[in-house]
Amino acid sequence: MEINKRIEEARKVMGKYKVDAYIITSSDYHQSEYIDDYFKGREYLSGFTGSAGVLVIFKDEACLWTDGRYHIQAEKQLKGSEIKLFKQGNLGVPTYKEYVVSKLAENSKIGIDAKILLSSDINEILSKKKYKIVDFDLLDKVWNERKALPNGKIFILEDKYTGKSYKEKVKEIRKVLKEKGANYNIISVSYT
């Protein structure tokens, strides 16, 4: 089966990086639920097309976690592959983080794409045992037909949608900065 071949290719790359497991989520750089094809590596490696799930590839097994919306779909799409399905939300089913901790010995190496996996998830795993995190994009190494990241143009929303022009907003921020004696303002968005 094609999926098993892809998993084996992933393991070969994991061997080059000397990692004991690699974690692949269904997210992009912004933790969006609906992602561009470039980020559908979990789908590429597992064959599971649901929008939510985590694939963990170990040296000796591959496991997929998904929620109740996709249990039946995942069973069908994983059939014939080596991937073991963990049905999130069912009694006694460990989370992928719990399973990684139960399976890997202390000082094991876990591969991740740190641009995608949440630091809070990694910190939760690291709080249980001492592991070495190895940051690399496994998908770039195994997914030859991977589409390029979209490269669209940005545009300015009209004032009727934003309430004020960006120039007015910047002017207001600069006024407050001056009043407070501040040199800069950091604007950030949280997706957690």
Task: Identify the residue ranges that each predicted region occupies.
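Conserved small/polar residues in nucleotide/adenosyl-binding loops
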Residues: 191-192
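Extended, Lys/Arg-enriched charged tracts that mediate electrostatic binding to polyanionic substrates
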Residues: 182-188
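Short, high-confidence coil segments that cap the C-terminus of an alpha-helix
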Residues: 19-20, 107, 182
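Short acidic-glycine loop/turn motifs at beta-strand connectors
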Residues: 57-61, 78
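Compact, glycine/acidic-enriched structural inserts
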Residues: 68-99
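Flexible inter-domain linker/hinge segments
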Residues: 142-182
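Hydrophobic or amphipathic alpha-helical targeting/insertion segments
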Residues: 100-146
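Intrinsically disordered, low-complexity, positively charged segments
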Residues: 7, 11-43
